[in-house]
Design a protein with these regions (language model features):
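Mid-to-C-terminal "cap/lid" subdomains and adjacent gly/pro-rich loops that border
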Residues: 1-78
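A glycine-rich dinucleotide-binding beta-alpha-beta segment and adjacent secondary-structure elements
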Residues: 77-88, 93, 108-166
Length: 166
């Protein structure tokens, strides 16, 4: 995940949820790189007021008190996030199992997802985060943060997992 913060108010919280623009520049395998397969870079909508405040507070960029509104205005509507979405390989250690210890209200077993990032995917993420930083720098972001993998996001694990015993 890469986020660029800009001096100018962009109104980046306006627009559709999810991916607004995406790039497939790095989607195919490039044999000159250290990883196989590729990833998309997705331009997302900026955060709304609550997420902006919580995120700025988390990174110690926002203080509650006398100058809160001015300080908040320095953050709100001024950021553009990019998501790096990798194409994993199916791997035996990733799997979906029935979870008999956690049942639903009808007594049916729940689902347990066992997933671990491969070294190849870690290399892809690293490459994507670097490209995202370059994009934000070229776009004129005054500050850039990168982090990942982001745990509670839209991971699509079915294609990388195995269900069953055979």
């Amino acid at each position: 995940y890469v986020e660029g913060k800009f001096d100018k108010f962009l109104g980046s919280f306006i627009g559709p949820e999810g991916c607004c623009i995406f790039s497939h520049e790095f989607y195919e395998t490039d044999r000159s790189l250290k990883h196989k397969r590729g990833y998309t870079i997705q331009v997302l909508r900026g955060a709304g007021p609550l997420e902006t405040a919580l995120s700025a507070r988390k990174f110690k960029k926002l203080n509650f008190g006398n100058n809160f509104h001015d300080n908040f205005s320095d953050h709100y509507g001024r950021s553009i996030p990019l998501a790096i979405v990798c194409e994993d390989f199916p791997e035996e250690h990733n799997k979906i199992e029935l979870d008999y210890d956690n049942k639903d209200s009808s007594g049916m077993p729940g689902v347990k997802i066992i997933y671990k990032l491969s070294e190849n995917t870690k290399k892809m993420l690293s490459h994507g985060l670097s490209r995202g930083r370059e994009i934000m720098k070229e776009a004129g972001a005054k500050s850039i943060i990168t982090f990942g993998p982001v745990k509670h996001t839209g991971w699509h694990l079915m294609g990388t997992t195995k269900m069953g015993r055979s």
